């Protein structure tokens, strides 16, 4: 895995693209496992944080400034865009994606292959694209 590389932060200049400074760090708390081929970008102006007792499967990408809570389980090929925040006890199935600057609450379950494009409150189970309440998703996709 790669931990602490520069995040993907650019803005256009007249003649080229300017890299936005990435001066934060990565903080990995106790009893956390990170799978093979995963990347965790350091923060831009704040830090990227992985909470304690969190398990990250293989090939996960965590962008700059992401904050993952405690006791989370995240399956392979999940991607987090910059500055997203996950609460505690979040479970995410494989190949799900979380757009940037979102807040995922505590005790949330996100089904595999889901695309999260808006905030998710505490104690929700979602899946699909766009991610929606699992009961609605199953009713609409029988």
Mark where each language-model region is.
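Long, leucine- and charge-enriched amphipathic alpha-helices
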Residues: 138-142
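Structural signal for interior beta-strand "rungs" in well-ordered beta-sheet cores
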Residues: 1-133
